[in-house]
Amino acid sequence: MRIIEIWFDDEHIYGKDESGQEYRQSLLWYPKLRLASDEERANYTFGLGGIHWRELDEDISFESFEYDDAEPSAMQRFFLTHKEINVAEFARSIGMNASLLRNYINGFKKPSAEREQEILSHIHSMGQEMINVTF
């Protein structure tokens, strides 16, 4: 599959392949593109295996448009939109390997339902602690 045309909206990059099939991916997977101006987004080149934005130092493979996880899960979306949370410290606080949590966040591995619930419960616990802060 080869993407021959791309376009954007505020939250997605869209691609059309040679057969006319359209695809989309969340820009949360590509923070540099998400924050880029229209002019920066328009300055790309097609390569043999993907799309390259030299000024942004960003690449998207053609293959990635066919991935099942074009949209981040709720857990992934939380961590991708809250960069202020230190993933290594969050993982340590629940006794999880930080690399494993990063793999969950970036879509390289999928957590079990139980593990995802454990992560969610800890996020809720942190939120409750923050709500209870007084000065």
Where are these regions (language model features)?
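Motif-centric detector for short Cys/His coordination patterns
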Residues: 1-135
